[in-house]
């Protein structure tokens, strides 16, 4: 027994101490008062974060790849007590046995990524990416986008229509290649002509199969003009992907907007995303969550109509992506998502807008056909790159 050790309760010397935890020999026990003393003192680091409600130090609760979660464990914290009071009778009984099913304590999520890493997904440029140097005409490319994107036909059905209706010899692989070439240019067109976004944004995720595994498309919508403001694709539904999508959605919100509101479902990744944007960009972003299918709280009741808008957008998105039956590469999903956003914002009339498109352009007003509008969009997009 080291002579430097003594009981921290009754100050008994080392002769009255013995190791209490076997081979680890990291804890001793006093023979006189039977209290425990560690062999080596813990080094306590100063607290990194504090609870804004009770000013109690937060402890590291969970460590993830892109985030670290800090939690307040004080039982008399005003935030915790207020959430306890909101529980109904059934929830209080459940809380006695399954307290881990409730999120009542204050959490703070520290993000491990930088603003430079928050890059919106974009289609890759193909080696033969010049849409004006293809073997077919620009009109044929516009026809492919009309049937494959605007009408939601699969690549094989699109090739069938071209061969048997228009007499154009094109394989389904040609349809896919041309779509990816066009998506590279349309992505920059979408970002350049998105216009001002509403101070209220609503978002949700849709999934698709890429090489047999789930990928997620984070879609954000402006409820007033019904236009897509963000369409980020990611293999994970983590905080980094949610932050990237939300950051792009509010990028064109007017600077004089006093308050920006983001409405999402109960996905936990959106909470640290809103915190990160408020912290790094000095934004005034308010995050609202619509939980479940029933209005069990006032927040869900107030913002559920906006959540239903994004659900209808997801239904439309799946109509255009389901014919693909999955993708071999991520670039396929990113490309069709980009082209869908182009179609939805600039070509698809909306009943709520008196059958106008969400993002009207003067260059497209005098063009009557969809293929003509696609051709004009490609010309404008090519001039941006």
Describe the role of every protein-language-model region.
Residues 180-181, 231-255:
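Active-site beta-loop-alpha junctions of metal-dependent nucleic acid enzymes
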Residues 323-385:
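C-terminal domain-tail junction helix/linker
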Residues 302-328, 333-337:
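Short amphipathic alpha-helical "interface-anchor" segments enriched in bulky aromatics
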Residues 11, 34-200, 205-211:
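Short, positively charged, Gly/Tyr-enriched micro-motifs
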Residues 1-29:
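N-terminal alpha-helical interaction blocks
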Residues 28, 266-268, 276-305, 309:
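Conserved beta-strand -> loop -> alpha-helix junction used to position metal-binding or nucleic-acid-contacting
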Residues 257-271, 293, 357:
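Acidic/histidine-rich, metal-coordinating catalytic segments
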């Amino acid at each position: 027994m080291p002579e430097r050790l003594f009981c921290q309760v009754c100050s008994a010397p080392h002769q009255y101490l013995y190791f209490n935890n076997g081979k680890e020999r990291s804890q001793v026990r006093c023979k006189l008062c039977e209290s425990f003393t560690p062999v080596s003192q813990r080094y306590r680091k100063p607290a990194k974060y504090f609870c804004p409600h009770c000013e109690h130090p937060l402890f590291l609760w969970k460590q993830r790849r892109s985030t670290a979660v800090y939690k307040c464990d004080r039982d008399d914290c005003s935030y915790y007590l207020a959430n306890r009071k909101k529980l109904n009778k059934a929830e209080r009984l459940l809380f006695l046995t399954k307290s881990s099913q409730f999120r009542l304590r204050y959490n703070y999520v520290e993000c491990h990524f930088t603003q430079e890493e928050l890059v919106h997904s974009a289609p890759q440029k193909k080696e033969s990416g010049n849409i004006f140097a293809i073997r077919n005409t620009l009109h044929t490319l516009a026809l492919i986008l009309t049937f494959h994107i605007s009408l939601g036909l699969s690549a094989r059905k699109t090739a069938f229509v071209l061969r048997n209706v228009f007499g154009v010899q094109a394989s389904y692989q040609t349809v896919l290649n041309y779509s990816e070439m066009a998506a590279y240019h349309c992505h920059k067109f979408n970002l350049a002509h998105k216009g001002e976004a509403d101070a209220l944004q609503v978002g949700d995720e849709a999934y698709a199969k890429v090489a047999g595994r789930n990928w997620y498309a984070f879609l954000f919508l402006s409820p007033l003009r019904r236009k897509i403001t963000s369409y980020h694709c990611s293999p994970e539904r983590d905080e980094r992907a949610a932050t990237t999508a939300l950051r792009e959605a509010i990028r064109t919100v007017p600077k004089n907007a006093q308050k920006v509101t983001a409405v999402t479902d109960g996905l936990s990744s959106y909470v640290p995303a809103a915190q990160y944007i408020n912290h790094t960009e000095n934004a005034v972003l308010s995050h609202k969550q619509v939980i479940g299918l029933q209005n069990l709280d006032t927040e869900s009741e107030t913002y559920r109509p906006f959540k239903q808008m994004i659900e209808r957008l997801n239904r439309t998105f799946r109509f255009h992506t389901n014919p693909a039956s999955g993708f071999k590469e991520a670039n396929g999903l990113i490309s069709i998502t980009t082209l869908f956003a182009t179609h939805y914002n600039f070509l698809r009339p909306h009943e709520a807008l008196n059958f106008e498109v969400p993002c009207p352009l003067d260059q497209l007003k005098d063009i009557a056909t969809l293929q003509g509008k696609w051709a004009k969009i490609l010309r404008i997009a090519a001039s941006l790159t």
